[in-house]
């Protein structure tokens, strides 16, 4: 069972993983001011959210089924651990090497893969290298 509050992108990502594993889910798009508190800033953001939903033909506060979020099994869900969790190991570093663990789930075949990758940091873009160097 999965239960939580998050933004629309997080909801679609969760729906992709759940569908790929043969599960089911429902969701609702709720304006920010109803979830995060009725402040002036949250009302402004909520107004923009509602406008985006209306432009896409999505009704706010309407229950969305899994099929509304992810139309078919032609998908791949991918997640890489940043910090250690029950599901994935976080990034570990030893000198010039960083190790990551990624979960891949293919929807059509329900194939689940865990991939451990070793990254040579001096071969990465300078921005990534600087972040991981410290």
Regions found by a protein language model. Give the residues of each.
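Short glycine/threonine-rich loop/turn motifs
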Residues: 13
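Anaerobic metallocofactor- and corrinoid-dependent redox/one-carbon enzyme cores
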Residues: 7, 19-134
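Glycine-rich phosphate/ribose-binding loops and adjacent secondary-structure elements
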Residues: 10
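Helix-rich terminal scaffold detector
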Residues: 1-4
């Amino acid at each position: 069972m999965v239960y939580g509050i998050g933004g629309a992108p997080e909801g679609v990502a969760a729906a992709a993983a759940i569908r790929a594993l043969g599960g089911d889910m429902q969701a609702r798009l709720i304006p920010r001011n109803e979830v995060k508190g009725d402040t002036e800033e949250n009302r402004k953001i909520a107004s923009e959210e509602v406008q985006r939903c209306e432009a896409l033909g999505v009704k706010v506060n309407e229950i969305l089924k899994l099929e509304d979020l992810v139309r078919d099994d032609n998908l791949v869900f991918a997640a890489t651990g940043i910090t250690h969790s029950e599901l994935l190991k976080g990034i570990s570093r030893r000198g010039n090497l960083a190790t990551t663990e990624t979960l891949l789930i293919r929807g059509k075949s329900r194939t689940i893969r865990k991939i451990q990758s070793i990254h040579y940091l001096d071969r990465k873009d300078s921005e990534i290298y600087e972040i991981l160097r410290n």
